[in-house]
Amino acid sequence: MEKLEALKKHFGYTAFRSGQAQLIDQILAGRDVLGIMPTGGGKSLCYQLPALMKRGTAIVISPLISLMKDQVDGLVENGVASTYINSSLSGTELAARLEGLRRGEFKLVYVAPERLNAREFVEIARMLDISLIAVDEAHCISQWGHDFRPSYKEIPKFIQRLPVRPPVAAFTATATTFVKEEIK
């Protein structure tokens, strides 16, 4: 399926916004990308569409439970099998979602960076065909990764544990030169 056809089918749009097509092409080609686009500029679509076009499951690292829920709700409304795994879930909900992930039921799974250190999640991820890893709000790697959310600095270790390195797509609305270097 061509990307414009997939865009129309999954999201109802007939054209890309500025910069989206180029980022999507890079991800589909298996390259790492850093997308810096304004708030409301369509960053999420730049990793969601490739996730739908590629085989496997995309892991999306997101800093806030509310962002995860909003993204997953929108995807599910569009008929996309997706979920989030975070601390808001009960033990039963968590077990059910991990089992669904293990069975490959989801095209996208949203997690906080801390989840990448959870033994059971890492074991499941190592068994999956991971299409890509997306880091939403990637400026948090620099701004939160040093003290407040040190798990952001652990993302490369998680990627190294995977049997096959997937493309990594990082997205943010704001990034200074220093932040860009830290993300890379």
Residue ranges and their predicted role:
Residues 29-35, 56-57, 105-107, 166-167:
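Pre-Walker A (Motif I) flank of P-loop NTPase domains
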Residues 41, 48, 89-132, 140-146:
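Conserved helix/coil segment N-terminal to the catalytic DExD/H
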Residues 1-38:
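Conserved pre-motif I regulatory segment
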Residues 126-127, 131-184:
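Post-DEXD/H (motif II) to motif III coupling segment of the RecA-like Helicase ATP-binding lobe
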Residues 51-53, 75-77, 99-104, 123-128, ...:
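Conserved catalytic network of the ASCE P-loop NTPase/AAA+ motor domain
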Residues 58-60, 65-118, 182:
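Conserved nucleic-acid-binding Ia/Ib motif block in the N-terminal RecA-like helicase ATPase lobe
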Residues 30-49, 59-62, 171-172:
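Walker A/P-loop
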